[in-house]
Amino acid sequence: MTETAGPILECHEVAKHYGALAAVDGVSLTVQSGETIGIGGPNGAGKTTFFDMISGLTPVSRGQVVFDGNAITGVAPHRLFHAGLARTFQVTSGFGSLTVLQNMLASVVFGAPKAGAGLLFNRAQREQAMHVLETYDLSSLSNSLVTDIPALARKKLMVATAVVHQPKILLLDEPVSGLLPAEVDEFIALMKSLRGKGICIVFIEHVMRFLTAVADRVLIMHQGKLIFDGTPQGFTKDELVRSVYLGSETRTE
């Protein structure tokens, strides 16, 4: 894919239909390089389906998705990853049967964790993996199985493995789900550090404090439609939109 100036991501009247049900109904969106966008809304609003279409996991019923100047409708997820579109999931990524270091090594070499890591890695690759773990304060857990490390560490590893190849855009699905308030604070700081590196971030989140602290723009979806696109300040002042968001099992702390 060719690199172009302008928006990093564009969605033009994107829709996903399951029979008569419109899971996503004509959503249009333009994301500039370096922006951080938070998406909220009730369960079933279409947020994850929207993410799945952007990342190539779910075919688009109508409309077009453009990434870095190229139409990507129908492009396989692994091709999008290598073009610079990284995606994490609500269920923490990584292989629990592997150590933290093995997961990081697999991401360094293969682009995503896969079984069998830790067997044929050279010294430079191991040094790179350890450097990334140190950057995310995970080096002390390098020999621990992913299943044995704390929730915050698993979230950090999820991000570290996704950004090791410096993606142009990072899609995060509920990144602070299951974290305690103090851990959310630490993850907010991590997201702000990624913003400082120029990585474009688009995330789905139910924790309002995280949404408003991290995002440049807040989008709210409801019944498959985009009903709000504005600043965090505008979102907090819009009582109608907030009522939709707060009705979605949202955590405010």
For the regions a protein language model found, what residue spans apply to each?
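A short, surface-exposed alpha-helical micro-motif characterized by mixed small hydrophobic
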Residues: 211-213
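Helix-to-loop junction immediately C-terminal to a conserved catalytic motif
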Residues: 55
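The feature captures the beta-strand-to-loop junction immediately N-terminal to the Walker
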Residues: 40-42
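Catalytic Walker B motif of ABC-type/P-loop ATPase nucleotide-binding domains
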Residues: 170-174
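Conserved ABC ATPase "signature" region
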Residues: 118-147, 189-192, 240
